[in-house]
Structure formats: C-alpha cells, structure tokens
Amino acid sequence: MYEVKLDAFNGPLDLLLHLIQKIEIDIYDIPMKALTEQYMQYIHTMNQLEINIASEYLVMASELLMIKSKMLLPQTNEVEDLDDDPRDELVDRLIEYQNYKAYTEFLNERKVERALYFSKHPTDLSHLESNETWSPDNTIDLTELIIAYQKVKNRVEFHTPKTVDIRKETFTIQQATSQVTDKLKQHESFNFFSLFNFTEPIEMVVTHFLAILEMSKSGIVNIEQAKSFDDINILRGVNYGVAR
C-alpha cells in the first residue's frame, strides 16, 4: 500500500508559485511548457486519488493551456504583437500574490512575537514635569530620557526582522559619540529620535543611548525637554568642541 502526501495550497496561484520554486524557473520569463506540464501532472494526481478539485484549479488549468497555445502560434509582423506577451497578465498576478503572501507571513510572525509581550497602562509622570535642562551642573531625573530610549528600542524591535546577524565589527561608544558630534556640527541642536531610522540593530540604539549619557556627564552635550512627554533635544554643551 502506498501513501501519497500532497502539499496543501491556498489556491492555484499558490500552487504555481510552489512549482516555479520547485523547478527553479524565472517568474519573469516563465517556460509555459514546463510549468503547464507540472501543473497538469498535479491535477492528474489529484484525480487519480479521487480528491475533489476546486473549480478555480480547473479554470487556471485552462488559462495555462490557452497561454501555452498562444506561445506556439507563429509570430506576426504587427507592431502591437511585439509588446504583447501572453504571459504578462499571469506574471503580474503571480508577483502580486507573492508579495501578498510574503507580507501575510511577516504580519503573522509579528503577531506571534507580540503575543510574548504584556502591555501596561501608561504611568502618570506628571509630577516629573520640568523645564530644566539636564547638564553636568544641573542634574535632573532621567526618567524621560529612559522612556524615549524605550520608545526607540520598541520601534527598532518591531521593524527589525528577528534574524541572526553575525558581524565581525561592533558599533562602539566612540563611533556613536562621533555621530552625535558630527550632527551637532551641522545643527546646534537636534531631536533625539532623529538619530535612528528604526531598522538598525538594537545594540546600536543602546550604544547611542550610553554615548549621550557619557557626553552629558562630560558637558559635551545638554539634554533638554520643555515638559513631560515632549520631544527630547540634544544641544551643544559647555565643553562641546573642547579638546580632550
């Protein structure tokens, strides 16, 4: 007794993408003969196993046969025929479905990852509201800066795929300090969030945060916020530009 296991597909386009990957053909230049044969073989196998075939699979089979027959017709000299590839519509549908499938998989992965986290209601930090500037001579509560750091960290974690990235080089505090210094050369102050594009590794966000703390302690930068939950700005400190 033989057991035949068939992959489950979400429609004929899903099956076609599977076959394209299986026989390693270019989706932009599909050899219709090979693809149609593989597709019809799959339909034939389902018939042999007496599996009920959805009508959409049969409709796609007829479309493939029609495209294949058009490809076999002799070429004409009419200009409009030169730009009319019978496969174009099929290729467009396959690419659109491929993008949709990739995005769906991405969202499902994010959903699984989000389920690992627990949310809490925002903490009332109104009692921390202040117009003070954090500088070496005027130390204030670091809660707001830590909250801003956490926002960046969360956005980076959401946008960055969870892959293992092996790198020989690491991003150092010295490099982060240089980036902040270069940014202050162009602007007297800048928004803390402008340091990030939210696709960088989380380690880089942590390094920037530590560098800014160190630069503030040294008087190279000041950290300013008008009131709680406002944007945090990085300004030139009293020791900015002083050789060390």
Swiss-Prot record:
It is found in: Cytoplasm. Its main location: cytoplasm. It comes from the Bacteria. Keywords: Cell cycle, Cell division, Chromosome partition, Cytoplasm. It holds the Pfam family SMC_ScpA. InterPro entries: ScpA, ScpA-like_C. GO terms for biological process: cell division; chromosome segregation; DNA replication. Transmembrane segments: none annotated. One of its GO terms (cellular component) is cytoplasm. Belongs to the ScpA family. Participates in chromosomal partition during cell division. May act via the formation of a condensin-like complex containing Smc and ScpB that pull DNA away from mid-cell into both cell halves. HAMAP family: ScpA. Component of a cohesin-like complex composed of ScpA, ScpB and the Smc homodimer, in which ScpA and ScpB bind to the head domain of Smc. The presence of the three proteins is required for the association of the complex with DNA. This is Segregation and condensation protein A.
